[in-house]
């Protein structure tokens, strides 16, 4: 696939850089006597300049690498002359797709309407990331936002996902309207579904007896993790799974057809996928490692074993897998220079280290995935089943789930589980095809089996909805949270306007909240906007009269609880001087406005 001399050169450079980074970390930064203290102004400037310079070179090298891989893929594109003459154009396929798949087209349309109706500015981190965009009358969206850069490239807490959220960053330059952003979310989601269905067709071989696209759509669109991720904007798993779907498709084609262009496109998606999630490398390297090990011990037909006298043949046969495994070296070098060194200098603890091995909440899909891995592994080792690319993907999905469990815990309904749910959905659809192909040989009617498969998919969704962590409850919970935030904010605006008309002094107290960056709160009417620090138990005037000074609460002050919830009670905040004057719902701990009466 690639020149072996070039591979050796790149590997040597990578390992050399890694060695230099390790020496720098343990031999220079740990004593760090010649460096300014991190808590000094000079130390902060040094850290910021280092992050800026290192990430600038990283982005330039990544762009060059992606361009090089795209060029190689284009040069090596192998097309069958018969396919070129008979294959429909992309536009023709798009135009005729609703006619060929009317149920899926209707499902996509209805799903998009629900997504757009759900669109809102009120998504946790977005309130801080775009705190000033409303103040500019939605006209200053085309600008670099420090909040996005700081969130990903300047964290200095040993986390590593430099490209996360940058798709949203770039999208916001084109339009500031969240309804348009949600349409892009829908396009990404449906692209994943279509590519996933195409991959399932390739993996199924001749057993394409079920409506694959419809089955895949039902299973993936109505999973709780899908709703959690795509009905919001703030989670990078959207792009990770989009890249993963493309990776699975080209890797399957490469595994079956051995086209060189597919190998380069696999490597391209794997390279980009490394930098959107710190655990994402498992999704792109574990399948390759699985194929490498399985083939080397003779479990894959038409792939050579690892023998001393045929090492060159082995290298040629597993060139893609070796390159994908080599991405670990690329990731390690980038992590050392972009995250480990600055984090070590900053002297902070690893983010969310207290969540390691904290919880493991599987669902039926994950159990089916684990059972498939176990059964097929035994049967492949016994020679009863042929190794498939699906086996590699399943191992990758399970490894990713265990990796999440080790890092931050695993919950199947959480947005972080989306890559696992994609692998699980692919596994279920392919297994259904294989099962129907087997039943068809036993004389069972194919049409009946196809309808039964779709009904079974709907039945699985129904079973999942018997729990509280399903798709519908997840979407409803998000909608209620967003509505409580915006309704409470609007109500506070009305109350403050009326207080102004009455000639009253307006002092608004708020506490720990996603609204702490004040972009939305500063638009309220007030004399003073006051922040109460729950940890220090101090009041500080953030805006208005006496800005920056301490404050002593007095009668008539407003206490605003948009999303603080139970934390006021948990931190022992004395609520006795306050009277509730508005409540979004007595069933929720947030969405409340109080007024001090003492």
Enumerate the predicted regions with their spans.
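Transmembrane-helix signature of polytopic, membrane-embedded enzymes
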Residues: 197-223, 241-242
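Transmembrane-helix motifs of polytopic, lipid-linked glycan transferases
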Residues: 183-207, 246-249
